[in-house]
């Protein structure tokens, strides 16, 4: 399983400031920064084997995905967030997926547990649930 970062903004933000058509245009926008990462002011995109590095800035930084999502929902700026936190807002139109033609970072996910001769039933149930949830979440994004 893996998740990838998605660039998004609210329709209200896009109406007021316009929609960036290329990653380079993000330099002129209000971006919501993820302080969880070092180098948060540089967003990376890939297209046709070319790496694009964009310096961004904005009014707000947080290491909490839900705060960044809420800031994007109220029109404070453009956010880059993990796909798994955005599927319902993208599906119902409260956020719009930007720069879809450009690839962003993809992160694998692992479930790590100790091995002592077998996986406890409760751990297996949790693993099955998470695998199914992330699979369905990815399928929902593919339909957008």
Kindly give the residue locations of the regions a language model identified:
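Flexible hinge/capping segments at coil-to-helix
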Residues: 2-32, 48
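Beta->alpha turn/N-cap motifs
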Residues: 9-11, 81-84
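Alpha-helical segments flanking ligand/cofactor-binding loops in enzyme cores
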Residues: 24, 69-70, 124
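Ligand-binding cleft/hinge of the Venus flytrap
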Residues: 25, 42-55, 89
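Hydrophobic residues within well-ordered alpha-helices
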Residues: 26, 71-75, 90
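Short beta-strand-to-loop elements that line the ligand-binding cleft
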Residues: 33, 53-64
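Short, hydrophobic alpha-helical packing/hinge segments within bilobed ligand-binding/sensory domains
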Residues: 67-69, 86
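C-terminal effector-binding regulatory domain of bacterial HTH transcription factors
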Residues: 83-88, 92, 96, 102-144
């Amino acid at each position: 399983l893996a998740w990838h970062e998605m660039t998004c903004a609210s329709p209200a933000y896009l109406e007021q400031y316009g929609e960036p058509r290329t990653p380079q245009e993000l330099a002129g926008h209000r971006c919501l920064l993820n302080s969880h990462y070092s180098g948060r002011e540089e967003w990376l995109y890939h297209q046709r084997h070319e790496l694009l590095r964009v310096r961004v800035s904005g009014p707000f930084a947080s290491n909490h995905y839900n705060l960044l999502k809420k800031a994007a929902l109220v029109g404070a700026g453009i956010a880059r967030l993990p796909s798994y936190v955005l599927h319902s807002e993208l599906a119902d139109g409260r956020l719009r997926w930007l720069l879809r033609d450009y690839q962003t970072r993809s992160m694998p996910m692992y479930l790590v547990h100790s091995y002592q001769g077998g996986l406890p039933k409760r751990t297996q149930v949790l693993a099955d649930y998470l695998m199914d949830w992330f699979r369905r979440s990815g399928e929902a994004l593919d339909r957008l």
